UniProtKB/Swiss-Prot annotation:
Cellular component GO terms, alphabetical: cytoplasm
Annotated organism of origin: Sinorhizobium fredii (strain NBRC 101917 / NGR234)
UniProt-listed PROSITE patterns: ATP_P_PHORIBOSYLTR
EC number: 2.4.2.17
Top enzyme class: transferase
UniProt-recorded Gene Ontology molecular function terms: ATP binding; ATP phosphoribosyltransferase activity
Entry keyword Hydrolase: no
Job of this protein: Catalyzes the condensation of ATP and 5-phosphoribose 1-diphosphate to form N'-(5'-phosphoribosyl)-ATP (PR-ATP). Has a crucial role in the pathway because the rate of histidine biosynthesis seems to be controlled primarily by regulation of HisG enzymatic activity.
Protein name: ATP phosphoribosyltransferase
Length: 231
């Protein structure tokens, strides 16, 4: 059986992932030229590499089209329903750190927690006859956090197709759920993160598709243990 590992196709994520695999004794070599979207692992005949975008990796692992992938935990948890039943987070790789957070306008001086925001959501319905509007690309994580974890139901999600942090200033939403590494972009847009508003502390992960064919197959454990040994 050939095992397929999906890796980021460009940028810092590609470089960092490749470096970890090389330290693990799994040097990634492009098939063809450097712009090729296929690769192999030097000395591992039954392993092939597919270079994909971070969001494609999440989707392909979730569907079982590839066996392993390296991508952000945020994309995996947002993109795959029933995520823990369908994939294994085999290793946290220590790069690509960013937080998915709830951020509100700085001028909301009396709103510092999710409980405060729940009060605001109820007040919006009473005062304005509409639900609190949340701009985000993370609708699944937002629903789980607001409705599941905090019991807030009076809101609506506005799909963000551009720069999410600009939505409150433009009037297209009241607050946002977005990903941030330093918080500087949020501050530049006069937004603040709620004190208990971190939904997910994400980083790059080695993720495995849970497939019956993997059970008892030594190559699966060999790949995971090789990567874990250098972290």
């Amino acid at each position: 059986m050939t095992i397929t590992i999906a890796l980021p196709s460009k940028g810092r994520m590609k470089d960092d992932a490749s470096a970890i695999f090389e330290r693990a004794g799994m040097k990634i070599v492009a098939v063809g030229n450097d712009r090729s979207y296929r690769g192999r692992v030097e000395g591992w005949d039954d392993v092939e590499v597919a270079f994909l975008s971070a969001s494609e990796i999440s989707r392909e692992v979730g569907s079982g089209a590839v066996d392993f992938g390296v991508t952000g935990e945020d994309l995996v948890r947002e993109g795959i329903a029933d995520v823990d039943a369908r994939v294994e987070f085999a290793a946290r790789l220590g790069f690509g750190h960013a937080d998915v957070v709830v951020a509100v306008p700085e001028v909301w001086y009396d709103v510092d927690t999710m409980a405060d925001l729940g009060d605001v959501a109820a007040d919006f319905r009473a005062r304005h006859g509409r639900r609190l509007a949340i701009a985000t690309k993370y609708w699944r994580l937002t629903q789980q956090f607001f409705s599941g974890s905090h019991g807030i139901q009076l809101y609506r999600i506005v799909e963000s197709l551009g720069a999410t942090e600009g939505a409150p200033a433009s009037g297209s939403a009241d607050i946002i759920v977005d990903i941030t590494s330093t918080g500087s972009t949020l501050k530049a847009n006069h937004l603040k993160i709620l004190s208990d508003g971190v939904i997910l502390r994400s980083e790059a992960c080695l993720v495995r598709a849970r497939k019956p064919a993997h059970d008892g197959y030594p190559m699966i454990d060999r790949i995971i243990s090789s990567v874990r040994s250098v972290l």
